[in-house]
Amino acid sequence: MSNNEKVLSPIEIKELERPQDFSAFQLKLASPEKILSWSCGEVKKPETINYRTLKPERDGLFCAKIFGPVKDYECLCGKYKKMRYKGVVCEKCGVEVTSSKVRRHRMGHIELVSPVAHIWMVSSLPTRIGTLLGVKLKDLERVLYYEAYIVSNPGEAYYDNEKTKKVEKYDILNEEQYRTISDLFEHTGFEANMGGEIVRDLLAGLDLFELLTLLKEEMETTKSEAKRKTIIKRLKVVENFLNSGNRPEWMMLTQLPVLPPDLRPLVSLDGGKFAVSDVNDLYRRVINRNNRLKRLTELDAPEIIIRNEKRMLQEAVDALFDNGKTANAVKGANKRPLKSLSEIIKGKQGRFRQNLLGKRVDFSGRSVIVVGPSLNMDQCGIPKKMALELFKPHLMAKLEEKGYATTLKAAKRLIENESNEVWECLNEIVDEYPILLNRAPTLHKLSIQAFHPVLIDGKAIRLHPLVCAAFNADFDGDQMAVHVPLSQEAVAEAKILMMSSMNILLPASGRAIAVPSQDMILGIYYLSLVKEGVKGEHKLFTDVNEVKIALDMGQIDLHAKIRTRIGDRIIQTTVGRLIIHEILPSFVPANLWNKILKKKDIGILVDYIYKEAGYEVTPRFLDDLKNLGFKYATIAGISISIDDIRVPENKIMHISKSKKDVIEVQKQFSQGLLTEQERYNKIIDIWTEVNNKLASEMMELVKGDKNGFNSIYMMADSGARGSAAQIRQLSGMRGLMAKPDGSIIETPIISNFREGLNVLEYFISTHGARKGLADTALKTANAGYLTRKLIDVSQNVRITIEDCGTHEGIEITDITSGNELIESLEERITGRVIAEDIIDPISNEILFAEGTLITEEDAKVVTEAEVKSVVIRTPLTCKVENGLCSKCYGLNLGEQRKAKPGEAVGVVAAQSIGEPGTQLTLRTFHVGGTASATQTERELKADKEGFIRYYNIKKYVTTDGKIIVANRRNAGLLLVEPKINAPFKGKVTVETVHEEIILTIANSTEEKKYFLRKNDVAKANELAGISGKIEGKLYLPYKDGEEVNLNESIVEIIKDGWNVPNRIPFASELKVEDGAPVTSKIITGAKGIVKYYKLTGDYLERRHDIKAGDIITEKGLFAVIADTEDREALRHYISRGSCIALNDNTEVEKDTVISAPAKNEQVVIAEWDPYANPTIAEKAGVISFEDVIPGVTVSEQFDELTGTSKLVINEYIPSGYKPTVILTTDDNEIIRYSLDPKISLNVSEGKRVEVADIIGKTPKATQKSKDITGGLPRVSELFEARRPKNIAILASFDGVVSFGKGLRNKQKILITDSTGNSVEYLVEKSKQVLVHEGEFVHAGEALTDGQISPHDILRILGEKALHYFIVSEVQQVYRSQGVNIADKHIEVITSQMLRQVSILDGGDTKFIVGDMISKKKFKLENEKIIKLGGNPAIAEPLLLGITRAAVTSDSIISAASFQETTKVLTEAAISAKMDMLEDLKENVVIGRTIPVGTGLYKDQKVKFSEQEISK
């Protein structure tokens, strides 16, 4: 609890009084005494009511004496009626005269003859009773169901006559064993028994303290991991009992509580039948069996019969508590299993989800929606009939207040007659009163918005066209629900926060969602088009009014180019655009409206106006835009005719050529030149190519048609409806179709819709269409479930304070996938608070100080300064105990302002991720065919300028002088430009002090120090390409103690980097030497004056002697673009070999060429064989073979093209053989190369090889079509933190690789660090190992192929690396589908997945090793222990999937209402868990104000202060 000192004591809930406000909720096991104290009497008979008199039977399940009167203040026999006898107990029928409401909470009890186990304690895993006794679940069940004996006192008993195996306490014996042993050892005190009694006695006899110490001792001595796990399980249960004050024997019931009768009602239906709650049937069975058992015991029946009856009693109680868990569930009259107490509370139809989290409410209605184009942004049309019903109470009050009616009855009559006064009053009420509209499915907060109602005739609700996008509504029969907010607070909230004019932005991304669509876009687009050579062209007008007059008089065309004055400038525009300009606020610059406005441009315009003017102006502007759009869409008269669909003339020619190509491919296939897969891929490629060619020709044709006024083209181009792909199907060719399994059918549909499809083509196309529909249905369900899980895990995240004061942050860069940018740094830092100063890499000035909230403009400044990474505060590094602080969260995107305390950011995050879920694809992508027909990479080219640095590169030089890469990893090429040059010749020293690196250069006479920030310098693992990005980081080419010459660069900025093996494969040929210059065309990035400088030390020295035409030969030359006041705007490095294009002091515009390479070609950095991985000779020497046996391990393959034959190692090598090539060098050193399957040998026995000669080549896996999990399944895989099936093994720390002796089907990889510690990994032989003997690997580097598990990233690289992994992976899925989601939402969920820790060492705390504890509890407990001077516990962070994280929530109610209800409740009851009711979900369930918004302060006294307002 927030203030831990508060001592909580249990509250007795009194009958008939409202329970007082409680601050926590706790579950415990009930003792028999407690059950008796609840009970108002024993239920002795199974009867319910008398079917003749319909009165409850005495002592039965509905007994009025026990549970209270059926009618208010009236006893059963009718002797006492009315209030005045309250509290009297009738002497005739024994019923207390009171309110009948007591039947909802008065309980009864059943006195059980024999103790019975509570099924949750037995079969809810881990079984609690079994764990305490140390008995397996199966055995425990056999004892409870009277099939086996449990030993309560072993005495001196043995299992055998030789007395070798002793009988222990709690051993389980079958009938035979029991007979034998008890005959032999009865006299020694041996006792065993079966059933509930003995289990209860054993539980009662447990000494928990003794058991605890025993277990702890055993834990320390045991070596076996499996045994430890079992001990930990037992320890947890024992500790739970000790801490909670529960007694173990309470898990066995001797008194069974009976639910109050009104909670298991018996309702009479018409026709004399009764609807009865299933629980009653289950209780009747228990009572029947209990009574029968009582009778049998009194009669002294034979043991076997009594035993059977006891077993049946146990089964009856089991069925009552949890009918689903029992093997053969009890079925009712309709052959359906009866709903037991557990089933009533769990599942979608259970108490939690059906009645507590979602309720039906009054003052609501629903109807079909139709469009209301004449409404304002915050209005909606409500049918009069509906309003009359919804506002009835308000209306009656109003009628009385105005004197139209004297009594309520009169008012009711007036309303029924619908007289004029009624409508008058209704209009007055409705005027000021907001209503809420909701469209199911309610996926995000914009699915419920408030409107001012406008009364209309008819029966449909009218909706404003611009809010459709937020509701995801259309008018094809959608329905919406209307709700009336009742309380003053609710009305205020609706008016201030929920009005649709306040909900213009999407909370997921901060972009405007209330933007015009379809017809409106078409109208605005039409208005903004230009037509050449029309009436009134090039005229000059004074203002818009003059233009309008001319237009109305027919003197000028709507699309004519004209000139007019706007502000103080004359502008060239068109009539239509002027009309648009008229509705724009005055501050909108011309470049936003004076152009053709498409959907995207309109969106940008709305965003801009919102940013500049906010809620005051935007709604009004949107309404004007809507009206304009509809008006001109109508005037334009755009309609589709069949002639608008233009088919390219040379379609037939293209298609016949493609058919020939296909026949050619088939021929090659039948001659055996192509494999089946290649044939298929080639055919698909042919058709894809022709389809694209036709499409581009057709688009040109349509675009030119009617000067760009072709209706279909206008619709697609403006973004109103349709797309290029759809036009292609109308008038190009339909193209290739997919089968339901996602594979592409190789026969394309050649026809288009204009020509019409033939039967076969139509049949092929039905395939895809049906799959689409089936997918959509599945997708909706999956997306809905994902949203539910996300909401549940993040519902308790809210902003609680302004600033948590942390200085920690996470470094972020662009998110890229390969070479494709997924999300830019600019987008990622907008609206975030930075955790470290942002420093300009060129001038070293502080651009923004720590703690600044970065706006969109600031983000642009950062990108223009070429800052490559920024450290921002994130929800993961926030230090607040409950929730987050405003600064770590950043901007509230839905309102574009700082998040305030009390905002439910967790729910918003979950909605933002879940809502677009339905737009994601469901399938896993099959790569192959068109999808991956990309050219294989065979070389690397540089596209920036600078010079080359080798990082760790080892090389072989071949006889003909080629440089071959000898590293397999941990090396790379860097493209750099100088940052600091050596001011004199000297020795370099590098030292790290805290967050700084001090670089000193010194000789006998002088010394100079340079200070660098540690974070700015590229780390070793970044240079090796393991983590992070290196562009923009600093590189130190000289190590500590090395000599450096004058003007050599000692600090360099990395502009690009290619690491081995990801970008440059092993054995590639390098085309550039270390230090070689790389030139490329340099273009100015800003406007200004070009000046040339030379770098000396760490400052620039002016050079006046550089002129156009010079070819640069010196290092360290920069061109600086300066503004008029000689401030540096940008600097460009000019590398050696560049030809200067501009003289010094030339004034330039943006995008002017400063210099270009003297030789006109792109610099190739490296080349390699794209189809094979070579094995090369490290030294010169002679080859010999081992285990290379033709017909056994190798086969000879004849190459048709070259006419030679080669040896190829077989794919499957018989066990016992290990084909190897042995190279004996000239120094008699022996190097062994073990040969992988499929490798083809380029050498023969006894052949001499030189350095870097190729020994053999392994073909790269012929492009297997890989299944890439994409779309929705990928997102849920990430959030569920699933361990991938094909998991990659990662190195746990930096070290050197070696291979140990392998097992039969596993190989052993060892990694040894610098101190000699080593760790070994066993890898399946079928896995491809990516490392080689003697290589150095970094922590987190993959040793084998496969997918990387997020758990490994967390374990090895920590939370920050995990943050990058999850955010970038989720963003890749959403961005590829065109969905924008801000990172902060994903981070909020990730921080919730990391809220648990796993205990490594319990110290002096109450935690046990292996416990999963929330970070909050862990911190509290540790603080407590440290105060007392003890040893704190040590833990490691755990990554839990969202389902696990939600179920392990600290709150009982929250976890129970999510999933696995019985498990959660059992756990909570045993450990007497306390729910502090801090989060949203539990407060919704118990019906209190939720702690967000103003509810955050509900416990605090609010003070009011008066203020004088000056008039």
Curated annotation (Swiss-Prot):
Q: Answer yes or no on keyword NAD.
A: no
Going by the record, the broad EC class of this enzyme is transferase
Q: Which organism is it from?
A: Aliarcobacter butzleri (strain RM4018) (Arcobacter butzleri)
- Which reaction equation describes what this protein catalyses? RNA(n) + a ribonucleoside 5'-triphosphate = RNA(n+1) + diphosphate
Cofactors required: Mg(2+); Zn(2+)
E.C. code = 2.7.7.6
Q: Where is Mg(2+) annotated to bind?
A: D474, D476, D478
* Sequence positions that bind Zn(2+) 1: C75, C77, C90, C93
HAMAP family per record = RNApol_bact_RpoC
Physiological role? DNA-dependent RNA polymerase catalyzes the transcription of DNA into RNA using the four ribonucleoside triphosphates as substrates.
Q: Which residues form a coiled coil?
A: none
The entry describes its oligomerization and partners as: The RNAP catalytic core consists of 2 alpha, 1 beta, 1 beta' and 1 omega subunit. When a sigma factor is associated with the core the holoenzyme is formed, which can initiate transcription.
Q: Which Pfam families match?
A: RNA_pol_Rpb1_1, RNA_pol_Rpb1_2, RNA_pol_Rpb1_3, RNA_pol_Rpb1_4, RNA_pol_Rpb1_5
Gene3D superfamilies attached to this UniProt entry: 1.10.132.30, 1.10.150.390, 1.10.1790.20, 1.10.40.90, 2.40.40.20, 2.40.50.100, RNA polymerase II, clamp domain, RNA polymerase Rpb1, domain 3
Instruction: Give one GO term, molecular function aspect.
Output: DNA binding
Q: What name is this protein filed under?
A: DNA-directed RNA polymerase subunit beta'
| Gene Ontology process terms (BP) | DNA-templated transcription
Q: What is the lineage of its organism?
A: Bacteria, Pseudomonadati, Campylobacterota, Epsilonproteobacteria, Campylobacterales
